[in-house]
Amino acid sequence: MLMLLLLLYTAHLDLALLQIASAQPVTEPEAAMVWPQPQKQVLGTTSGYLATKDKFAFVAANPAAAASAPLHQAMIRYRAIIFQREPEAMTWIGRCDPDERQLRWPCPPPPVVPSRTLVLQTLNITIGSPDETLSLSTSENYTLSVVFPSASLFADTVYGAMRGLESFAQLVQPDHSIRSQQIVDFPRFPFRATMVDTSRHWLPVPLLKAHLDAMSYNKMNVLHMHISDMPSFPFVSTSLPQLSAQGAFDSNHVYSPAIIAELIAYAKARGIRVIAEFDVPSHTYPSWDPIGVRGGNSTLLANCSEYPFGFLRVDLESTYDFLGTLLADVSKAFPDSIYNIGGDEMNDACWNQSAEVASFMKTQGFNGSDLTGYFARRLFDIVRTRSALYHVSSSRHSQLLSLSLFCVTLIGH
């Protein structure tokens, strides 16, 4: 019975695929939708086709555009995306077999491309400013006008031009048809991020680059690297090499300053910033224990074995010296103005269980919240010396600090 059902399912699937293969392609270009939805998209009444690969051109239309290396890189990328294959060579089923050797149906004939009476020859790109700084205030605005025979793209910066190129690529349909229209667009939010947890799951560089590509297709602009946590410490600190030597999964599962610089350059070429998170004061054991000692003999971690997240010895001046040294290396590797300090899942019971920390709290007249605030202020002072804005992952810090705190992400980020 199982075999019969499988055969019936296979026959049904074959029939469905054959029906798709024999369907006639749409000759009148539909209105392609852009993702994310633009602020304004006005469709025209005419439709035409992109010129062939050897004739279509992106044109840097003003001196700022002509001098922009990131823009020229983006034009090369999007030309490759648009012209992955010529329409005449396309098949509507990727798994058909031209020689009929493996599957039971041949490839359908290539789609018939109508006479190209309206042909888009160029996309002229103009950028208003040569400034290539990428920050929270960077403009990503653009205006895209598709009018035959030449389209135009105007942007304040090269990063706005990148967003416009992405929209243009989405407008081109598989048969290279495109409809006249105008798009006026700007991001609703200046900070549009995804987070990758490279402590729990070390990710190879090619995979991170593929993730950055996917972000650029969705016009996202911040990669948040949760780079350290309990499972591993993959960041190679030049001043504290023992951290990754002892804390990484192995010597191959690390991110050296050279690797990070490569990722940041790859991201910036796509209009994406990279910010780092080193989660403190919890989520530090065992990866932050460079000598493999926990408890009373540790000069870095508190003795609270019942609380597996691990906590720093916030009572010791040496802890802040250690953090200052580490953050100096972090700021060199990650030049962005925003740095995430974690701060989630803190538990007062851990510090109360540590004899040394409990003694410090008693001497200072601190309760758990007071100690949290003390640590936060000390850490924020260190971060400020690096000319960085701080970003935390717990609402608890926001209860202890002034409203000048840059941003607070609620627990559960």
PLM regions with names:
Residues 1-3, 274:
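Positively charged n-region of N-terminal signal peptides that target proteins for export
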Residues 4-12, 17-190, 390-401, 405, ...:
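Acidic, contiguous N-terminal accessory segments
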Residues 58, 274, 383:
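A residue-level signal for conserved active-site and pocket-lining positions in enzyme catalytic cores
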Residues 62, 219-220, 278, 345, ...:
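Generic short alpha-helical hydrophobic face used as a protein-protein interaction/packing hotspot
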Residues 80-84, 88, 170, 265, ...:
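A generic structural signal for well-ordered alpha-helical segments enriched in polar/charged residues
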Residues 130-321, 327-340, 354:
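Feature activates predominantly on carbohydrate-active enzymes
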Residues 303, 308-399:
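Active-site neighborhood of glycoside hydrolase catalytic domains
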